[in-house]
Curated annotation (Swiss-Prot):
GO term, biological process aspect, one: regulation of cell differentiation
GO annotations of cellular component type: apoplast
Origin species: Arabidopsis thaliana (Mouse-ear cress)
Region named Disordered: 73-107
Source species taxonomy: Eukaryota, Viridiplantae, Streptophyta, Embryophyta, Tracheophyta
GO function terms (MF aspect): receptor serine/threonine kinase binding
Protein known as: CLAVATA3/ESR (CLE)-related protein 10
Chloroplast as UniProt keyword: no
Residues bearing attached sugar chains per UniProt: N27, N30, P102
């Protein structure tokens, strides 16, 4: 008789465990997707509002296309640092680069 009284409690406990496990897995998948940065290619980025000033559809589409081309062809603003200079121990000055191989000016 004791088992019949505990049956609703057991069902509620199992239901609670299943819902918390499902919520935990749902949060885990959302968390992993949120940490991955969304990198959108510049070509597919939303166009600037300046193209909305064109009333003709052809001019507006050309403006959007030119903005996409311009946005995707941008170069990074920083350049790599120059290599460190080497000091020649013999002369105490900076080493110079000397080309190797045959002289291209000599026939």
């Amino acid at each position: 008789m004791k088992t019949n009284r505990n049956r609703p409690i057991n069902i509620l406990i199992v239901f609670f465990l299943l819902t918390t496990a499902r919520a935990a897995t749902r949060n885990w998948t959302n968390r992993t997707h949120r940490t991955v940065p969304k990198v959108q290619h510049a070509y597919y980025a939303y166009p600037h509002r300046s193209c909305e000033s064109f009333s003709r559809p052809y001019a507006r589409s050309m403006c959007i296309e030119l903005e996409r081309i311009h946005r995707s062809s941008r170069q990074p603003l920083f350049s790599p640092p120059p290599p460190p200079t080497e000091i020649d121990q013999r002369y105490g000055v900076e080493k110079r680069l000397v080309p190797s191989g045959p002289n291209p000016l000599h026939n």
